[in-house]
Amino acid sequence: MELSCSEVPLYGQKTVYAKFGKNVYLPEDAEFYFVYGGSHQRHVVIADRVQDNVLQSSIPGHWLQETVTVSVCLCSEGYSPVTMGSGSVTYVDNMACRLARLLVTQADRLTACSHQTLLTPFALTVEALPALDEELVLALTQLELPLGWTVLGNSSLEVSLHRESLLHLAVRWALPKLFHFLLCLPGGVKALKLPNEEATTPLDLALQGGHSTLVEDITNFQGSHSPGFSRLRLNEEATLQFVHSSETLTLTVNHTAEHLLEADIKLFRKYFWDRAFLVKALEQEAKTEKATMPSGAAETEEEVRNLESGRSPSEEEEDAKSIKSQVDGPSEHEDQDRLPLDRSFDGLKKSKHVPASLAAGQLSDVLNGGDEVYANCMVIDQVGDLDINYINLEGLSTHTSPESGRSMLGPQACMHTLPPDTSPCGRPLIENSEGTLDAAASQSFVTPSSSRTSNLNLSFGLHGFEKEQSHLKKRSSSLDALVADSEGEGGSEPPICYAVGSQSSPRTGLPSGDELDSFETNTEPDCNISRTESLSLSSTLHSKESLLSGIRSRSYSCSSPKISSGKSRLVRDFTVCSTSEEQRSYSFQEPPGEKRIQEEEWDEYVIPAKSESEKYKVSRTFSFLMNRMTSPRNKSKMKNKDTKEKEKMNRHQFVPGTFSGVLQCSGCDKTLLGKESLQCANCKANTHKGCKDAVPPCTKKFQEKYNKNKPQSILGSSSVRDVPAPGLSLHPSSSMPIGLPAGRKEFAAQVHPLSRSVPGTTLESFRRAVTSLESEGDSWRSRSHSDELFQSMGSSPSTESFMMEDVVDSSLWIDLSSDAQEFEAESWSLVVDPSFCSRQEKDVIKRQDVIFELMQTEVHHIQTLLIMSEVFRKGMKEELQLDHSTVDKIFPCLDELLETHRHFFFSMKERRQESCAGSDRNFVINQIGDILVQQFSEENASKMKRIYGEFCSHHKEAMSLFKELQQNKKFQNFIKIRNSNLLARRRGIPECILLVTQRITKYPVLVERILQYTKERTEEHRDLCKALGLIKDMIAAVDLKVSEYEKNQKWLEILNKIENKTYTKLKNGHVFRKQALLSQERALLHDGLVYWKTATGRFKDILALLLTDVLLFLQEKDQKYIFAAVDQKPSVISLQKLIAREVANEERGMFLISASSAGPEMYEIHTNSKEERNNWMRRIQQAVESCPEEEGGRTSESDEERRKAEARVAKIQQCQEILSNQDQQICTYLEEKLHIYAELGELSGFEDVHLEPHLLIKPDPGEPPQAASLLAAALREAESLQVAVKASKMGDVSQSSEESPGGTVLMDTPSTQDVPASPTASLVTEGTEGRGCWDVDPGLQGVVTDLAVSDAGEKVEYRSFSGSSQSEIIQAIQNLTRLLYSLQAALTIQDSHIEIHKLVLQQRESLAPSHSFRGGPLQDQEKSRYLEKQREELANIHKLQHQFQQEQRRWHRTCDQQQREQEAQESWLQARERECQSQEELLLRHRSELDHQLQEYQQSLERLREGQRMVERERQKMRVQQGLLGHCKHSRQRSLPAVFSPGSKEVTELNRAESLCHENSFFINEAFGHMSLNTSNKPNPSGVPWDAHPLEGSHFDLARTSESPTELKIDISQPPDVNSELWTTGPGHQRPALQENSKESYKNVADLDSFQSESSSPQDSNQRGPQPQTLTTEAKLSLPMAAGHGGDAGDGAEENILYL
């Protein structure tokens, strides 16, 4: 079962869905309940079936944060609730719950700012609160408000004139639902008008906040509203709550441990189905709460006064309007308040079957002053359409017109009726001491809310009765007399029944005449057909003629279930209740005989006339009705009807059936075969095709009829359902409480008969009389309870004795159902999450599936045991009253079986819970073997052997007893009903017994499958292997016990069949009789049919019985056994001197030779086959060997010889014990050595090498161990070791030369004391074992070295192999060591056994002469043959030892050779290692040299790179010089001398440009030649230097010099006139000068390189230094200066001319 939600808030009210598996079908006609079980509370809620396997319900509120168990219970008629599944839901405390608790506690401490301060702890804002509106209301609904609490706070506090209330807070938060809910709480109306400290009411706050919805609701509010829920406290522990919003009715019970689940569900059903009673109880609860409310919580002072006077404010008005309120109906707002609750309760009835006679309209009419009340079913003939007056208890009359009567036929008519304790004028009826009913003068107090709620009384039943109209037609309660009254009238309208309160209401509005005729009401449903429920029936019949206005009425106590063909009459129930709802007593009075009116006279008294609407009333008594019902005409009718009903009931709907398992035919009780079998589609009865006519009636149809006819008690009788009635006796003059719980099986058995003067002996007889109208017409005769119980089973409705509550232990079944629900999946992989399953390995999944199957089948087995125990055995003991010993023969050891398997399952369940990984759903059980070992070993194993041995032994006996009991009709009916039980799951007793006997055979299969997917060499694998062996031993022991029991039973059967007078004569003349076989020591060992060959060659059929001391031959005669008499030979042969030999050339014959002291005798016996002959010979030989000694055998022995023999035996036993102890000690030492080797291996770092520190054999004193298998295993391990060593050798040869060297270690050479017979083996074995310590730490290495030196005196260096091969070698050595040690232990034990056998043989040989007289030559020959066989076996043992020693020596030689090869290889490897080391050192030196060379190379490379850079710079310089030379050649023709004035700004600007561009740059612009002389002397007006103009154009060239250029300073400080004179000279003057100096210029160009390393001379610097205007240039050419006028260069006044 899966639940749709796992967490809910504390207030609940969430819809939950429960989905079951596909194989689970939920019946449509059953009721389902959700049971929420917590630590202190239990909630019961009804559930709806929405699909075939889905249920829907509502989660109730809970008061504690915890995880509760959710159980789904199924209820069907006649059965106890059955748990279908279980789950869990966690209740959590959310924000709405915390805020609701805060509002309740802070109600009297609110201020104007509380709407903000209260939200601070929750980090909420006012804008987020509307989402919590509905949740807050639900949380407040769930809370239990403190005593005296109101909306204004504690009622004990004085209410101030101005204070903040919860209504103000709800308006400020804008929560309309919370506001309406608070209005319904105590003090809500007063808080609505109460202003706060700011003098504002909630209405003012709503207007200010703009909450139009709240403003409208407050404005239209005219009174209190329903709070949305109703709560009823039944007692201190039980509470009912109905929530209108979710339409949920919840029963909450405290102290769940003290309540049975079944009782709680019954209590819930009582109130759920009896709604009028529920509403009345809710009204009383409301009145109680109102009456106990303190005055401080009252709304006004007037209400307080009314409260003290015991009347509500509306009662005075209702007193004046009583008639009008009944006819006109309730007010508008009352209708609005009632309708939701009506619809809510009607909603609860959806898809539910309402009982057909749930309730009947109840009226109280007091005739002649109201002194007498008629409680029978009144049939009032109303003819005419005139208005009818009805007199109520107060004398008020209700006038009902036809129109108003018709208007009340609908659902609104249900709201016009109030129960008597809520009506202002109603008076409850109290029983006086004389048994009559008087009207009490007390009045009931009604509050406005309770009066509105009470009006729902009638409406609850209407919805159900409208659904069951067709069903009611079939069950109308009219007698044959009513048919006579109705003849000739029109057809009747469909009957409509009203459900009213349990007490009659005098204010009930009634329809008019025609409508009254269409009504038919039955107040006694229990008298109709079914007897399962009892009703408080009151009837006080008086025949008075002074009736009010002579109204003619008829009164009946019961009615025939016939459909009235005429016009039905209105049947009114005048049942009145006493003030005590727990007990109701009425009296049956028999009027005088002369006032009885026969049926034929009824018509003359019943004359329909409109004017006679108020005339005479005639009452009938029970005696008349009894006579009427048993009339001959009715009897004949009932017989014909019974015949048809029985034929109809017997009809099955057979279809071809398919069955799983062994089933029996319901008709002949034989095994069913699939092809010839039929199955009823209704009751699932199985039968052969030829036996279908003999099958009992269809139980399903009977069950449906039973459910249909089973009545529900009317509203007035609900409160007395569960009142126990231990003893019931009816007396004609006394009143009797007859309320009984429905379905109680004790009822019929505890009814005592009445006196003979009463026609109906008991109330049960009366009810049976009513039921007999369908089943049997003569059921008035007295019958014993047991006869009626079993004879009517299956054919009569009186099956309530078996339709009773189940006897299954509820808590036990609930626990088991939850376990079964947990293991209902098909496999483990379907239980866990798919993601979790996908992460597991394939073998793990398969292993978990098998473990899950083991646990699942264990749960099913426990269920089968529970079915046998609680369904069948308990019912057979308690219901059938069978003898306990008889029942225990059918179910032997059942309690012990159940206890054992439950303990086993709980152990596995605990392991499953411990293995959970992250969540309860995901689990992986890693260990299950230890639980299996614990279950099938020691005490548990012996217990299971005993229990299963006894159970399986008595299987046949139980089945035969069961078949014998099935001959009883009572037992057959019981078994059929129990088989149809839901808990039985269609399993009968034979199936259950067979399943139990087969259970132990399932364990080996499951354990083998678990073992298949378990890793070997693990503790789990060993445990599983051990558990498997234990299980097989247990099964073998059970089989042996079953075989022994069967043989014992067979021996007893044979003894019973042996003729008492038979006898036979022995060889010694003694007579052997049957009585001699009755010895307790004799047991049957083997039996079978053989053939005794006579002297004439004929064969006689003989029954041969092999007992513990004799062999019997019996033959059958007249179905009895007698001693066989063949050839005058005795048919009793003693086993003391019996020898069995084969017959030559006859494979099926054998000779039995008896060498008795009286004389030998030989028998020739033949069997059916050779195998049977060999089996007989083997069993005879075993019996002879184990045969006890003959009584007279020891008489001839002397006491001294006996004492000597005993002393020898004692000495042999002592020697055997000593040898066993020594063997045990040797085995212990060997295991200790293995343990030490394992520890050394772990310390040496071989984690992957595993060694079990246990020997492979156990010292068993019973049988010596077999050494051949150990020897073969040792040889195989030696071969694997040889292969591993060779593989490692080849790997080492091909190993790389760069492998790092390893160290050396010394081998451990242990002492040679371990194997005395073969010291070399011990030396080699332990020497190889010592190699496991090859890389130990220095400290341990020293210890090993010392040990080796001290033991062997030599050192052996060892070189390690590669990692993988070395681990394989070490592992092989470890395994070989273990095998050799085990072999050594086996040989030691075998030697001990050999010595013991030698002593035994010597003892026998010494005793042989003294016992020679007992045997003869044949027995001596047999002994010699046995000794010869022993010698052969001993020789075989010595031969095996010799072979083992040879193999051991050969293996030692092989080991020595391998060791020498390994030592040689080790020395070669060491030499190779030294060579590698020298080569490594040489390589290191070469590497250092190469590093040095590399460093020098890098330095040279750096220098080379620097030289390359220098060459590149020189190459660049050359390119520049070449470019400059070409440029000079190109510009020489066009260059002109430029004369600069010394003080000109152009020169200054040119200087500045020089300094900006480069220190050693000189720019020559040929544009100077074109410049005007006028502009050369003018300053630069714009202030822009010359170099700012386009100097980078094509007319400018840059000449770069070397690092040490020659400075040439030109003095241009000539006057302006000179400059202008020079510039004014035309080109013709300058051109010749250039041509003359061109050669010198080219000559200077050729000398360009001479200026790279020269610097300017000091003379030039001195001459050119102090000039005011200078031009600095850098040039590689030495340009001569020509004076324009031939002046000196040193003169500053000379004009400097530069030629380019």
UniProtKB/Swiss-Prot annotation:
Segments of this protein annotated with the region Interaction with PTK2/FAK1? 1292-1301
Swapping residue 1568 to A leads to an effect described as: Alters interaction with MAPK8IP1
Q: Which UniProt keywords apply?
A: Cell membrane, Coiled coil, Cytoplasm, Differentiation, Guanine-nucleotide releasing factor, Membrane, Metal-binding, Phosphoprotein, RNA-binding, Zinc, Zinc-finger
Write down the Pfam families for this protein, in alphabetical order. C1_1, PH_16, RhoGEF
Where in this protein does the record put region Interaction with microtubules? 1421-1700
What are its GO cellular component terms? cytoplasm; plasma membrane
Stretches of Polar residues bias are at 1309-1325, 1664-1675
- Locate the Phosphoserine modifications and list their residues: 312, 314, 478, 623, 1535, 1604
- Cite the residue spans of the region called RNA-binding: 1493-1524
UniProt GO molecular function:
guanyl-nucleotide exchange factor activity; RNA binding; zinc ion binding
Compartment list: Cytoplasm; Cell membrane
Coiled-coil-forming residues are: 1421-1522
Q: Where is this region: Mediates cytoplasmic retention and interaction with YWHAH?
A: 1369-1380
Domain of life, per UniProt, equals: Eukaryota
Q: Report what the Swiss-Prot or TrEMBL entry states about this protein's PTMs.
A: Phosphorylated on tyrosine upon stimulation of cells by laminin.
Task: Cite the DH domain residue spans from the record.
Answer: 846-1041
Biased composition, Basic and acidic residues: where in the chain?
A: 330-343, 1191-1205
State where it is primarily located: cytoplasm
Subunit architecture: Homooligomer; forms some cytoplasmic aggregates. Forms a complex with MAPK8 and MAPK8IP1. Interacts with RHOA. Interacts with microtubules. Interacts with YWHAE and YWHAH. Interacts with PTK2/FAK1. Interacts with NEFL. Interacts with CTNND2; prevents interaction with RHOA.
Task: Write down what this protein is called.
Answer: Rho guanine nucleotide exchange factor 28
Classification of source organism: Eukaryota, Metazoa, Chordata, Craniata, Vertebrata
